Each structure stands twice: as C-alpha cells, then as structure tokens.
Swiss-Prot record:
One of its GO terms (biological process) is thiazole biosynthetic process. NCBIfam families: ThiI_C_thiazole, tRNA uracil 4-sulfurtransferase ThiI. Catalyzes the ATP-dependent transfer of a sulfur to tRNA to produce 4-thiouridine in position 8 of tRNAs, which functions as a near-UV photosensor. Also catalyzes the transfer of sulfur to the sulfur carrier protein ThiS, forming ThiS-thiocarboxylate. This is a step in the synthesis of thiazole, in the thiamine biosynthesis pathway. The sulfur is donated as persulfide by IscS. It comes from Citrobacter koseri (strain ATCC BAA-895 / CDC 4225-83 / SGSC4696). It is found in: Cytoplasm. The keyword Signal does not apply. Its EC number is 2.8.1.4. This is tRNA sulfurtransferase. Keywords: ATP-binding, Cytoplasm, Disulfide bond, Nucleotide-binding, Redox-active center, RNA-binding, Thiamine biosynthesis, Transferase, tRNA-binding.
C-alpha cells in the first residue's frame, strides 16, 4: 500500500532552506509514529510531498488514521501506483478502479500531471471521462458538484489511482518550533490550548498543580497521555506534577479573601517558570480566555505576567467557551473534561477583577516563599511514555490477571469509536462495554457481586481507572492483561 502525504500550505511558502528543514523533520516524525505499526515501512521525502509505503495490509486503517493526526500534514492520498503506456491504458485502469463507485452517480475526472508526456492534463481528463461515460451506462458527467470525483495523478511513466483523500490536522511539524510547558488542569481550556501549540510545531511538556489528591492527578495524567499519544507521540515529553496543597493552605491562612485568586495564579506562574528554566523550556502555555473568570481580566493577567520573565502564551485568549468546547469535542478531550473532578482550593467570596499591584505585593509579603520553593523542588517528573509503569507502581493493591474465573466479567473501557472499530470478543467470559469516561458515574450501577476485569489495548487507561475505582471504595476491580 502507498500513501502520498501533502504538506501544510504554509510550509510550501517558506524559503528553500526552511522548507527542506520542515520536510526533513516531518519525515522523521512520520517514521517515529508509524514504526509501532510496521517496522518495514518506507518513508521517502520529496520536494512537494512525502511517500509512505508499507507491506502489512492489516495495518492499513491504523496507519491512515495515525497519519491524519500528525501535525504538518494537510491531507493524505491513499493511492494505487501502477505503470501505464498511453492514455487508453490510463482509461482502462481507471475503469477497473472506479466502475462500481460510479454506478448511478454523477462524476468528473481531475488529473494532475508531472513529467514530459505527449498529452496534457485536460486531454487525459476528457479521454478518461468520455470513456467512463460510455462504458458505465448509469453514470453521468457533471463538472460542478459531482457525486464522485475521479482523481488521477500522472508522474513520468507511473499512474497514481487515488482511492481516497483524508484530511490531516495541518499546522507545522512538531520540533520545528521550540519547547513549551503547558499548565494543564484536565479541563476544556488547557487541553485545547496544549493541542493548538502542538499543531503549531511545539513539543509540549505538561505541568500539573495538584490541588485535589491522587484522583485529580490520575485524571489529568489521562488527558496529557491522550493528547501526547494522539497528536505528539513522535517526541518524548515530560509530565511534571507539583503538590500545591501546601501553597493553597498558606494562601488561605495569610492572604486577603479578595486577592486569593490572583495570588494563586502568580504562585503557579512562579513555580512553572522555575520548572521551565530547569528544563530549558522557552514559554508557558495556559488556557486562559479574556474575561472568562475574575482572574482573567486584562489588569489581572498583566499582574500575573509580571512575576516572571518567561513568555506566557494564551492561544485561547479571544475564544468563547462554546468555541473551546467544540474544539475539545473535535480533538477528543471533551469527555475527559466533562468528567474531570473539579478542585478549587481557593474560592474567594468577592474576587477582585481589577487587582492593584501594591496591594497584591503587600499580601504576598505575608507568604512564606520557602513553601513554594519546597514544592517545586519535590515535584515529580516522569517521561509521559512511562505513565503506564508509574501507574503500575501506584496501583500495587490492584491485581493484574491474564485469565478469568467463573465470577469474572471483562469490562471494555475503550471509547465508543474504538469499541465499534474493534469489538472485543473472548470465549468463555462475558464482556461488558463501559467507556472510561463513564466509570465515575456508571460503575456503581453494575452488578457488584461480580469481579470486574478492566481492559484497554495498552493497559494504561485500565490501570489508571482501576486505581481511581479503588480510591472510590470499589474492591471488586482488577486489571486484565492477556
């Protein structure tokens, strides 16, 4: 099988040296992602496209899906690459490929040609279109808005029969821009802002301020791992977790009620800036939108920025909540965000929307900054690929099994789309489907006399969810890894 990767248009208008660098980086990213599906595949870069050739037909859908999620790709063409002799040969091959698809439909033919030939692209379109119209009685030519467009590409002595076109996410290849650190909370905003910077070519690391215990961190790990696995798995990234409960306690004790929100954000920026400096990261990323909450007025944002020299990027600054939720739905983080436990350790009764710098600084004079230094120093830092192993260490009390007993039921916790694409069927045991994002609200409705064996393809989500359910008091859960 063969795929032709078309570049994001902004890449094609770069200077020659920059364009070549972007294409080289994108080629490497494609190799890094696809090697998990087929180690024998070939990725070949050209000036205006990249070819992907693979042998394992069983991985066709998986490879195609992975390509649509790699930043820097505008669209993917799935093609059949065959030799040809003349225009009539092109027509005959197109007839075999498209006959069934054109029955009872309107169609047109569109040809792109590269190389030296005795015919033009328009001549091929007319010849092939006329031939198809004559040989398929129920088909009819329609040049504007046809039911089917027959796409052909002629390159030297090769004919590319385009079997399908699939849109990519666009943007720049990850690694063409410098690293950033996303302040991720697991909600709608931070997930979308992280995705937007990945799509713009940045390697996105994650920094999480834990205000609500292990359950909150588990949920945020899921979001970060999902974003990385789906859009950024070509690169290694860090997941940094900072226990911010001591900082919140100090704020509650020492800071005036109305100033708490701004002071908390300033503390987070200070801590994140220290982490960014430690790892050589150039900017912070937040999901703040202008006017969304009291701390996100222009005055307050300016005061928050003042505590650090590190650049703070806010890709959602002009977005409304509905737009953000729609984007979260498109990238697949909506369900995470809707079920994410909400923790707010600092809730002001009357938060200021126009903080005064002198007053904020006066309140911060009461704060013991050694507490902030301590939590940053003790922050955990893991390679996001090791989240499964890290979770395995955390879930020491959750048993992992490879078989099942008479009272066991396997619980498939994959998303609905994954379940539909690859239904789980195992002889000798009942299989129940319940997506991971419904476990927190629906698991209690299941038969609690049964032992539930949580299963997902890679085992990451099942371990995370097993720990979460154990913390909620459910002892009848195990992790199933055949």
């Amino acid at each position: 099988m063969k795929f032709i990767i078309k570049l994001f248009p902004e890449i094609t208008i770069k200077s020659q040296s920059v364009r070549l660098r972007f294409i080289k980086i994108l080629t490497g990213n494609i190799r890094n992602v696809l090697k998990h599906y087929d180690e024998t595949l070939a990725v070949v870069r050209h000036w205006d496209n990249i070819e992907v050739r693979a042998r394992d037909e069983n991985q066709r859908l998986a490879i195609r899906d992975a390509l649509t999620r790699i930043p820097g790709i505008h669209h993917i063409l799935e093609v059949e690459d065959v030799p040809f002799t003349d225009m009539h040969d092109i027509f005959e091959k197109a007839l075999v490929q498209y006959r069934d698809r054109l029955e009872g439909k309107t169609f047109c033919v569109r040809v792109k040609r590269r190389g030296k030939h005795e015919f033009s692209s328009i001549e091929v379109e007319r010849y092939v279109g006329g031939g198809l119209n004559q040989h398929i009685e129920s088909a009819r030519v329609k040049l504007t808005n046809p039911d089917v467009t027959v796409h052909l590409e002629v390159e030297d002595d090769r004919l590319l029969l385009i079997k399908g076109r699939y849109e990519g996410i666009g943007g720049f290849p990850i690694g063409t821009q410098e690293d950033v650190l996303s302040l991720i909370s697991g909600g709608f905003d931070s997930g979308v802002s992280s995705y937007m910077l990945m799509r713009r070519g940045c390697r996105v690391h994650y920094c999480f301020f834990n205000l609500g215990g292990a359950a909150h961190e588990i949920g945020v790990r899921q979001v970060a791992h999902y974003l990385w696995n789906r859009f950024g798995s070509s690169h290694r990234v860090r997941f940094v977790a900072i226990n911010f409960e001591p900082v919140v306690g100090e704020i509650l004790e020492k800071v005036d009620d109305g100033q708490m929100g701004v002071v908390l954000k300033r503390m987070m920026v200070r801590a994140a800036s220290k982490v960014a400096e430690r790892y050589g990261v150039q900017a912070l990323v937040t999901g703040e939108a202008l006017g969304q909450v009291s701390s996100q007025t222009l005055t307050n944002l300016r005061l928050i920025d003042n505590v650090s020299d590190t650049l703070i990027l806010r890709p959602l600054i002009s977005y409304d909540k509905e737009h953000i939720i729609n984007l979260a739905r498109q990238i697949g983080t909506e369900d995470f965000a809707r079920t994410m436990p909400e923790y707010c350790g600092v809730i002001s009764k009357s938060p200021t929307v126009k903080a005064i710098k002198a007053k904020i600084e006066a309140e911060e004079e009461h704060f013991d900054f050694s507490i902030l230094d301590k939590v940053v120093e003790e922050a955990s830092n893991v390679d996001i690929r090791e989240i499964a192993q890290q979770t395995g260490q955390d879930v020491v009390e959750v048993e992992t099994v490879s078989g099942f007993g008479p009272n066991d039921v396997i619980l498939d916790i994959r998303s609905v789309d994954e379940q539909d694409d690859k239904p789980l069927k195992i002889e000798g045991v009942d299989v129940v489907s319940l997506p991971f994002y419904k476990l927190s609200t629906k698991f209690g409705d299941l038969d609690q006399s049964k032992t539930w064996l949580l299963w997902c393809e890679r085992g990451v989500m099942s371990r995370l969810q097993a720990l979460y359910l154990r913390e909620q008091g459910f002892q009848n859960v195990k992790v199933y890894r055949p």
